[in-house]
Amino acid sequence: MFRILLSSIFLLLLVVPVGPSYGACPCTYTPALPIEVIDGGAVWFLVEGEEIRVQFADIHTPELSPNSENANWCEEEGRKAILARDFVSQHLGTAKEILLDIHEIDMNGDTVAVIYIDGIDLGQELLYQYLATENTSDTPLWCQ
């Protein structure tokens, strides 16, 4: 009985596909090449021969400059936005592998995805560095 169980496990291991595994997510990972970092929250990538603009999923990053949606913008937000942009640019530039876990296409036509660099969630890294906040309905107050 034990021998049958071991044989079954061995056969199962032979047929289960092996690939990137990040957590318990049943995700599909799409390889990508960075083209241009727009800011800390958006990047142009080359994906399967097509240029796409990708917004980070689940996080909000500071804005580089004031806009109509951001009446509370201040110089501190601009400073943090530059740090976030440079952080993303540096990490994408040194990554050996970049994978996208695409969540959706937003109403502006941007792809919303989790960006993995060498198996690490780049959005989470921005959160750890205090260069992003979790994407909630609350407007982040960078200028406190």
Feature map (PLM): residue ranges:
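Small beta-barrel nucleic-acid-binding modules, primarily SNase/OB-fold domains
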Residues: F2-L5, V16-Q144
